[in-house]
A protein has these predicted regions:
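Active-site rim elements
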Residues: 40-46, 116-120, 178-187
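Conserved beta-strand->loop/alpha-helix structural units within folded catalytic cores of enzymes
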Residues: 1, 19-20, 51, 203
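Short, well-ordered alpha-helices that flank and scaffold nucleotide-derived cofactor binding pockets
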Residues: 2-6, 198
Length: 241
C-alpha cells in the first residue's frame, strides 16, 4: 500500500486493508496496556547493512514522536546511541555465563557450511538442517546462538537456514554480542507499524480489523478479475472496477 501511494501515485481512498485479527501488524503486532501488560508475538531482526528496502521505505514515513524526522532516522539515531551489546549470550544449567568467543566449528562443520553457501537453493528443497550437518554441528556455540536468535530447530528448512545465513552474514564476527542488531526505540509495533499505519491513513487508506475472507468470486474468462469477497460472518461485498 505504501509503495502504491508513494511511487505509483495511487489514490489511497481506493485501498482497503483487511485484517482477520483485532490488531494490525501481522507477526509484528502488539497489544495490551500498562495495567495488563503487552504481548508482541514477533519482530524483525533488523540490520543496518542489509535491510536496504526497509530503510528506503521508512525514510518516507514520518516518526510519530518526531514528525520532522523519518522512522529510519529515528531508529538509526536511537540504535547508534544505545547499541546492542549482550554479555551473556549463552548460560549453562547453573546460570554460569559461557565463553562464546569461538564458534566451536571443526573442519567438517566449516566444510559443510561453505558447501551450503555455494549450493543453489533449488537443490535444497525438502531438506532439513539436520540432513546437511553432522551431529557435532548441533553442539557448537554457533548453533546454540543462531538457533536461539532466529528460532531454528534441527528439522527446520535448510534453504530457509541458508537464506538467513546470506542475509545476516555480517553478524558472524559479532554474534556473541549481537552488536549488529538494530534496535527500535520501542517495540516494533509502536516504532514501525503504527507510523506506517498513520501514513497510510493520512493518504486515505482504510483499515478493517476482525474481517476474515473465506471466498472470492471471479468473473468468467481467462483473466483473473475478482468480483466479490465473502467473509466469515456471512457478509459479502461486491467489487467494482
Amino acid at each position: 500500500a505504501a509503495y502504491l501511494v508513494r511511487d505509483a501515485n495511487f489514490d489511497g481512498h481506493n485501498i482497503h486493508i483487511l485484517e482477520s485479527m483485532d490488531v494490525l501488524g501481522g507477526s509484528n503486532d502488539g497489544a495490551g496496556s500498562v495495567q495488563q501488560g503487552f504481548v508482541c508475538r514477533g519482530g524483525r531482526m533488523l540490520n543496518e547493512e542489509t535491510y536496504e528496502n526497509f530503510w528506503e521505505l521508512f525514510r518516507s514515513i514520518p516518526s510519530l514522536e518526531q514528525p520532522q524526522r523519518s522512522v529510519t532516522e529515528e531508529i538509526l539515531n536511537f540504535d547508534h546511541a544505545h547499541p546492542t551489546c549482550a554479555h551473556a549470550r549463552l548460560i549453562d544449567k547453573d546460570a554460569k555465563i559461557l565463553d562464546v568467543r569461538s564458534m566451536g566449528f571443526d573442519n567438517a562443520d566449516r566444510l559443510a557450511m561453505t558447501k551450503l553457501l555455494l549450493t543453489p537453493e533449488e537443490r535444497l528443497d525438502n531438506m532439513t538442517i539436520e540432513d546437511w550437518f553432522g551431529p557435532h554441528f548441533f553442539e557448537t556455540n554457533f548453533w546454540y546462538m543462531w538457533q536461539t536468535t532466529f528460532a531454528f530447530q534441527k528439522w527446520s528448512s535448510l534453504f530457509e537456514f541458508r537464506r538467513y545465513m546470506n542475509r545476516m552474514i555480517f553478524e558472524f564476527p559479532r554474534i556473541e554480542t549481537l552488536e549488529g542488531v538494530t534496535r527500535t526505540p520501542y517495540n516494533q509495533y509502536e516504532s514501525v507499524i503504527l507510523p506506517l499505519k498513520a501514513y497510510l491513513e493520512t493518504n486515505g487508506v482504510r483499515f478493517e480489523t476482525g474481517r476474515t475472507v473465506t471466498d472470492i468470486d471471479f468473473a468468467p474468462g481467462e483473466a483473473l478479475t475478482a468480483t466479490a469477497l465473502h467473509f466469515s460472518d456471512g457478509c459479502a461485498v461486491d467489487l467494482r472496477e
